[in-house]
């Protein structure tokens, strides 16, 4: 499938149209950002690692009955996906306290959250992705109640599948972000799942194996991503 015009350029991915109006090409770049794009650096192999990582995870979720936009892997850094009507709200599932939750509530990083928390954030970089709730979604018409309930259901189902996948590989799935859209009226998982949008810690050492290595200037970003990929069985080369 040939990519045509650039449709959208995000912080780490570029979306292209194709000759099929229902399909898009998603290109993973080497860019890495923090602070809503205020800080951007490039890392060799990152686009390839995240593309193959994402394809692997989406395939696992499809196998578990979670509909995704994934169609096929095109190249090291490109994937063919369904064109979704994206919901402007992202879902976050939290198994342990980290990131904005720690800052917001003043709680200790790493404490277990049982049951896991489900948060909603409006996708708006200029406003720093403000936290919202189901009432906001209804009032502002971002997503209807039925589809939001389905998004929540699929988010928790993904958490069950992925917590086991990473757990079996000696990793803790601390939290993660999911974005959904509609394809022919059906709620479908879109965007990506990679260490860019999740927190993954080593079970024994609690070493951070995700984008916090970049956010917190810990170093070894790509090495950590590749280690996680290797542990769960992603074929990178």
Curated annotation (Swiss-Prot):
Task: Give TM regions.
Answer: none
The record's catalysed reaction(s) read: 5-amino-1-(5-phospho-D-ribosyl)imidazole-4-carboxylate + L-aspartate + ATP = (2S)-2-[5-amino-1-(5-phospho-beta-D-ribosyl)imidazole-4-carboxamido]succinate + ADP + phosphate + 2 H(+)
UniProt keywords, alphabetically: ATP-binding, Ligase, Nucleotide-binding, Purine biosynthesis
Q: Which SUPFAM superfamilies match?
A: SAICAR synthase-like
| Documented EC number(s) | 6.3.2.6
Q: Which Gene3D superfamilies match?
A: ATP-grasp fold, B domain, Phosphorylase Kinase, domain 1
Write out the pathway annotation from the protein's UniProt entry: Purine metabolism; IMP biosynthesis via de novo pathway; 5-amino-1-(5-phospho-D-ribosyl)imidazole-4-carboxamide from 5-amino-1-(5-phospho-D-ribosyl)imidazole-4-carboxylate: step 1/2
This protein's GO CC annotations: cytosol
Example GO biological process: cobalamin biosynthetic process
Question: What class does this enzyme belong to in the EC scheme?
Answer: ligase
Q: Which family does it belong to?
A: Belongs to the SAICAR synthetase family.
User: What protein am I looking at?
Assistant: Phosphoribosylaminoimidazole-succinocarboxamide synthase
Organism encoding this protein: Pectobacterium carotovorum subsp. carotovorum (strain PC1)
């Amino acid at each position: 499938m040939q990519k045509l015009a650039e449709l959208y350029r995000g912080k780490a991915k570029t979306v292209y149209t194709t000759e099929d109006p229902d399909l898009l090409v998603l290109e993973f770049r080497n860019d890495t950002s923090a602070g809503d794009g205020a800080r951007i650096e490039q890392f060799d192999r990152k686009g390839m690692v995240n593309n193959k990582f994402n394809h692997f995870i989406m395939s696992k979720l499809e196998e578990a009955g979670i509909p995704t936009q994934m169609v096929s892997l095109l190249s090291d850094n490109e994937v063919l996906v369904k064109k979704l009507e994206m919901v402007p709200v992202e879902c976050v599932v939290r198994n342990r306290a980290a990131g904005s939750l720690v800052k917001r509530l003043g709680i200790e990083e790493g404490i277990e959250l049982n049951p896991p928390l489900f948060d909603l954030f409006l996708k708006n970089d200029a406003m720093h992705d403000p936290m919202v709730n189901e009432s906001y979604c209804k009032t502002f018409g971002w997503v209807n109640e039925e589809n939001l309930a389905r998004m929540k259901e699929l988010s928790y189902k993904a958490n069950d599948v992925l917590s086991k996948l990473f757990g079996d590989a000696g990793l803790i799935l601390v939290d993660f972000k999911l974005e959904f859209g509609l394809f022919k009226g059906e709620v479908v998982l879109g965007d990506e799942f990679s260490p860019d949008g999740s927190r993954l810690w080593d079970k024994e050492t609690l070493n951070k194996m995700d984008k916090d290595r970049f956010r917190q200037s810990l170093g070894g970003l790509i090495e950590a991503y590749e280690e996680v990929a290797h542990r769960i069985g992603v074929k990178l080369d």
